[in-house]
Amino acid sequence: MANELNAETLNVALESIDEFAARELPDSLLIELDEEDTFPEELVRRMSSAEELGIQLLFVPYEYGGMGGGAFDVYRICERMAAIDVGLATSELATFLGSDPIRVGGTEEQRREYMSRIAKEGVLFAYGATEPEAGSDLGALKTIAEPVAENGKVTSYLISGAK
């Protein structure tokens, strides 16, 4: 994430989050979601949608239809969201975390396909990094992904370990 938003753009994004929260996230709703242990999928989709709040656009590189935000911007957005509701902040951060391996290590075709869909469609991602023996300690993971090649081109990965 080499890019960063300029200060004005970041401030507008943070203000937009505050305005959305004031309008759409009353304390009573946040308490209800917490008490019912409910994932508010439709609300998260609205927050991700370019037509509403477009939080995910901040994380997507310019060339795929996003705003090209950097690590500092991710931190500030998540910090602001967490001040409103940790569950919603985690939900929004999940797409960033889930798409980061594609952004960093995916092929150009994969980046174009999936990063563009986050920007255009508000597609949500998830990130899984646990194993029975490791929990969420990434350093203790034992799963290995071995490339599977056909005609000299990697077409998939064979994954070992227990998930």
Model-flagged regions — what are they?
Residues 1-92, 112-113, 117-120, 153:
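Amphipathic, small/basic residue-rich leader segments at the start of a protein or domain
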Residues 39-48, 103-107, 128, 140-144:
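Alpha-helix boundary/capping detector
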Residues 61, 77, 98, 107, ...:
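Hydrophobic/aromatic pocket-lining and membrane-interface residues
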Residues 66-67, 109-163:
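Glycine-rich, Trp-frequent "lid" loop and neighboring beta-strands that shape
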Residues 71, 78-79, 87, 102, ...:
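Alpha-helix boundary/interfacial micro-motifs
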Residues 78, 82, 99-103, 115, ...:
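Short, well-ordered alpha-helical packing segments
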Residues 86-109, 135-138:
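N-terminal glycine-rich flavin-associated loop
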